[in-house]
Structure formats: structure tokens, C-alpha cells
A protein has these predicted regions:
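N-terminal-proximal low-complexity accessory segments that begin disordered
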Residues: 1-43
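Internal helix-loop-helix
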Residues: 47-135, 181, 187
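Glycine-rich beta->alpha junctions and the first turn(s) of the following alpha-helix
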Residues: 229-324
């Protein structure tokens, strides 16, 4: 099929997928207002003729064909840096396709246990790459009582598990939580949420299926209202993406789409690999947002005439330090990359984990600085409608 255009991507989503939002069953997400922003965001990544980002979005495969760079397997530091650059200019609807890097980076380890699984991984990767499809990172199970293992829960279907093994495939049941962009991509790439023990073979499962596979149901939720005014919310209005509660109601998965079915020694391998690539994307996003915070803090301070205020300057200095620590950590992780036996390079695991921890541990303080600098205007500043109203606007 080759590269899709934005309109091709949008039409590809009208495929009979079963999805809900606010209690409403939505037969065609391309026509529903709740999905307008997330679909439009992801469609931007299909603009290969964009004068600024078109070249960054494309690369040549080993076959000489064009593909989206999200599928490029980095083999040099420069290619790894190109990936970082791409992800800083990419919607989360495309960024979650880093799940394919997680699979490909452990393909050889999987092959040592069961070569057929490794062949399935490569086949899926090439299928999605060559058809310009997007995949979601489907990893987090509803964990119930966290003192208990997966097979010890009162409800055996809290974790996704195999309920039937057949000659032509497996049948799975259960659910996954917090699945970003699940309704606006093409493939649900399911991974183990953690390592599994020998008595949990049914829960050691990994596979990929199309979103419209019978038995798959997605319940969407978003922290943002349905429509955010870009004037009042210049950043948030352009970054709305639903989180999916993905249900597998006795879903059949053919063997050629299975990457793990009971081989518990591979569960940790797959979970850790996805964790690394997911955290890398998280750190890239953290660098971008932290730099935005610095600029916002400076604007608010200048608006209030407090450029020389000692407290304001100290707060901005803390925000700058936070942003630079994250940026330098990401740079270090790429310069001190690690490499698989087959030559695929990936960010330094320790550096990425440390950066992700630092980001999360200090994020609330950065928001506190912004609140302190902005004051009550954060909540009570009149909106665009009041500004445009000739009667009230003249006072604003």
C-alpha cells in the first residue's frame, strides 16, 4: 500500500471497530465530535509533503521504499537522534507506535526460545511499516488486589489471559487499562504487564490484532472536555488524546499474530523492552513540556512587571534547571547508547530510567512554580467570549 495521506488514514478508521465514549456507542469515530481533535492530530503525521517536517517523517527502507520514520530501526547514533527529533514533532497517536521498536529489539532473544514468534514479530513489523499503520502499546492490566499474583485474583479475567488453545490460534479474555490512542490507531499490540511465574502460563501472552477484531471493545476517557477553545487553551486544545479501557471478550488470535503464549521466561523480556521505549518517548515529551513551562513562566513574569523580582527569578531558575537536566539526560542516553547483537541501537537504559524518575519526581514542583507565578488568573481570567463581547470586552 505504501504511504497514506491524511484522508486515507481518516477513512481507514471507519472499519467497524467497537468503541464507546461517555456511555455512547460510536459506530464511526471519524464523524463524531469527541474524536475530531485526536484524529486531526494523528492525521498531521501523514502529511509527507509538509515543507518543514515531510523529510523528517520519511526514510528509505532496505527495499528502497519510503516509510514513516517511526518504523526506522536505528543502527547509528545519528539515526537514534533522528528518532528523538521525530518524536518531538509527532502526535502521541503516532508516537505509541514505538511499540514496534520494543518488539524488534528483543526479536533475537525471542527466537532463542521459539523461532516462530520472532518470525511473527518481523512479519507484523513489516506489514505495519509497509502499509503505514499505527499500533498502540497495550500493556497495563487492571491489577485488582496488588498483594496477589495474576492467577490469585478473585476475578481471573483482570489480567489478559489465554482461555483456549486451538490448532489455528488462541482465545484471550481480560482487559487492559490506560491505553493511549487505542481507538485512533490500527493495531493493538498486547504485551505482558510484568514478569510471570511458572504457574501463570496463561497470563504470559503477547500478540497483535486489528482494532476491529471481533470481541474487542474500547471504552474511552479523557481528562479534557469535548471541545477546548484554542484561544483560552492554546496548548491543551491541540493535545487531546483519549485513553482506552480495552476489553478482550473471548478474542481469537491466529498463531501468526502471537509473540508469546505461555513461555514465562519471555514475559519480563517483552515488558522491560516496551518500558524502555515508552519511557524514552515520555522523556522526549517531558523535555518539550519543560521548555514550554520556562517560556510560559517568563511571559507571565513580564506581564506582571516582575522581571527583577527575586522570588520570580528564583522560580524561573528552578524551571530552567529542570528543563536542562531533562534535556542533558536525554542527550546522554543517546550518546551513550546500547546495542543489540544484530546492531540495533537504543537509548542507555539506566540514563532513561533515571531521567523518567527525575521528571516524575519533580513535575509537581514545576507546576507549583507556575501556579505561584500566575496567581488567581489561572482560574479566573475571563475567556475569549467575554473579550469579544463589545459590552464586556472593553473592560477586559
Amino acid at each position: 500500500m505504501g504511504l497514506m495521506r491524511p484522508e486515507d488514514y481518516i477513512s481507514s478508521l471507519n472499519d467497524g471497530r467497537v468503541t464507546y465514549w461517555d456511555g455512547e456507542s460510536i459506530p464511526d469515530i471519524t464523524q463524531h465530535p469527541r474524536f475530531r481533535v485526536p484524529i486531526a492530530l494523528t492525521a498531521e503525521d501523514y502529511k509527507y509533503d509538509d515543507p518543514e517536517l515531510g523529510a523528517l517523517r520519511r526514510y528509505k527502507t532496505e527495499d528502497g521504499t519510503d516509510a514513516h520514520r517511526i518504523f526506522q530501526i536505528p543502527r547509528t547514533e545519528d539515526e537514534l537522534n533522528k528518532r528523538v527529533e521525530l518524536l518531538s514533532h509527532t502526535s502521541i497517536g503516532t508516537a505509541v507506535s514505538s511499540v514496534f521498536m520494543a518488539l524488534m529489539s528483543v526479536k533475537d532473544q525471542v527466537a532463542q526460545v521459539k523461532p516462530e514468534y520472532a518470525e511473527n514479530i518481523e512479519r507484523l513489523y513489516k506489514y505495519c511499516r509497509d502499509n503505514d499503520l499505527r499500533g498502540a502499546e497495550v500493556i497495563t492490566d487492571p491489577k485488582g488486589d496488588r498483594k496477589r499474583r495474576a492467577h490469585e485474583q478473585d476475578d481471573p479475567d483482570l489480567y489478559v489471559r489465554i482461555v483456549e488453545r486451538r490448532a489455528d490460534g488462541i482465545v484471550v479474555r481480560g482487559a487492559k487499562l490506560h491505553i493511549t490512542a487505542a481507538s485512533v490507531i490500527h493495531e493493538l499490540v498486547v504485551m505482558p504487564t510484568k514478569g510471570m511465574r511458572q504457574d501463570e502460563t496463561d497470563y504470559a501472552v503477547s500478540f497483535s490484532i486489528p482494532v476491529n477484531t471481533p470481541g474487542v471493545k474500547i471504552i474511552n476517557r479523557n481528562f479534557a472536555p469535548a471541545e477546548l477553545n484554542p484561544f483560552d487553551y492554546p496548548a491543551s486544545s491541540h493535545h487531546s488524546m483519549p485513553e482506552g479501557f480495552v476489553i478482550f471478550d473471548d478474542v481469537f488470535v491466529p498463531w501468526e499474530r502471537v509473540f508469546l503464549a505461555g513461555e514465562v521466561q519471555l514475559a519480563t523480556v517483552l515488558a522491560r523492552s516496551l518500558g524502555l521505549w515508552e519511557r524514552t518517548g515520555g522523556v522526549i515529551g517531558a523535555v518539550d513540556s519543560s521548555e514550554l513551562f520556562v517560556g510560559l513562566a517568563q511571559l507571565v513574569t513580564e506581564m506582571q512587571g516582575k522581571e527583577n523580582d527575586a522570588v520570580a527569578r528564583s522560580s524561573i531558575a528552578e524551571l530552567i534547571t529542570y528543563a536542562q537536566m531533562l534535556k542533558m539526560s536525554l542527550d546522554y542516553a543517546c550518546r551513550h547508547y546500547e546495542k543489540t547483537e544484530t546492531g540495533m541501537v537504543y537509548p542507555n537504559t539506566l540514563a532513561i530510567n533515571a531521567a523518567k524518575y527525575y521528571y516524575a519526581a519533580n513535575y509537581h514542583n514545576t507546576v507549583k512554580y507556575l501556579h505561584d507565578l500566575s496567581g488567581g488568573l489561572v482560574l479566573t481570567l475571563p475567556g475569549e467570549a467575554d473579550l469579544r463581547n463589545p459590552e464586556s470586552g472593553k473592560y477586559i
